[in-house]
Amino acid sequence: MSAGRPEQKAEDLREAMFVIGRAARAASRELALASNSTKNAALCAMAAHLRQQSGAILQANAADLEAAKAGGLAASFIDRLTLTDDRIEAMARGLEEIAELPDPVGVTLAEWTRPNGLRFERVRVPIGVIGIIYESRPNVTADAGGLCIKAGNAAILRTGSDAFRS
């Protein structure tokens, strides 16, 4: 098959998804065991990285916006796609706020003892890998990724194609 045929592209996508899935599964094992301080440090590092890379992010977003406008997308869609210094700062603050939340992992939600003495507990545990597909809203990437990390889960995030560069 030639590289341009749809069958080849589908096979390439399938292989890419397997690679991403395997990497996410491996990461999920580490995240599930990560301490709250480790997860919080990662969230704060993500916030710092957003701030440090804001110029490059805004430049990439400008390319996404140009393509969206050329494609005749609605003004409301373009507004949701648009990043500014203030919006990037809000994304970074959101990650820091997630870091300040209590660790949800290991919290006992319920416990009971059966008449035969057998004791049960319902405890919050990480799910493992969470896949999220969402509209072209760059801020969702930070919010969803941050919440997944806080809960000890790996995430596979897929934004709309209009925000790939952002």
Where in this protein do the model-derived segments appear?
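Conserved small-residue-rich beta-alpha loop and adjacent elements
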Residues: 100, 104-166
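N-terminal Rossmann-like NAD(P)+-binding subdomain of aldehyde/semialdehyde dehydrogenases
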Residues: 1-118
